[in-house]
Amino acid sequence: MGICIYYQGVLRDRNRLFDLTMAVRAKCREWGWPHRFVNERIVGTMEILVDHGSGGEDWKWEWETRPVDDRWRGIVVNPPGCETLYLTFGRDGRLIAYKSAPDRQPGHYIANDLLYVKTQFGGPERHIGICTLLRLLEEYGVELEVHDDGRYWETGDREQLAHQMEIINNIIHLLAQEPQRLAALVLGEDAGDFEVLDVEVGKVFREPKPEWRREWGISAEEN
């Protein structure tokens, strides 16, 4: 639950990637946002979500396993309080993120070219900052498609964004503070067996690297 920004796109002129990355780095340094560069050879197999159909009755998404030999470059940003922002590109210029599958052998990846970043617990200013970085990508020739749950990308309305975030925060805190009461409303008599977990609202989870990769460096040059 929470406000997210969804984005996909392609960089037609890949000669502009270096300048684009440096421009994003400059903003991250200005704001104090953690970031790292990526320049990796991705070889093996990947699982990727594929759109089958054109939105009609037979439309569906399916995971497919495919061979992959790609060069993955760009910058990965960690806006405080938000999920990871991948501004990274494959050899064909598409925005894409690769993650090593934690339960598989080396050389198997989860790939995603339909990207999103959750900003609910980062607040309006960091949400706006992420939109600023995406606009920066457009300045360097990235053709973007963006959907913003907070509508800031489309409207530039900070007050509307802050209001939507506040409403969702209130709902989340209600769910966290009165789980037994809510369980009783939903489950009735069965609520007595409802287990309440001790969770930290707003905590950002970082996916651990698989055991075989934890001694690697951040990136590796293409062979």
Give short role names for the model-derived ranges:
Residues M1-N223:
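Acidic (Asp/Glu-rich) sequence patches and key acidic residues
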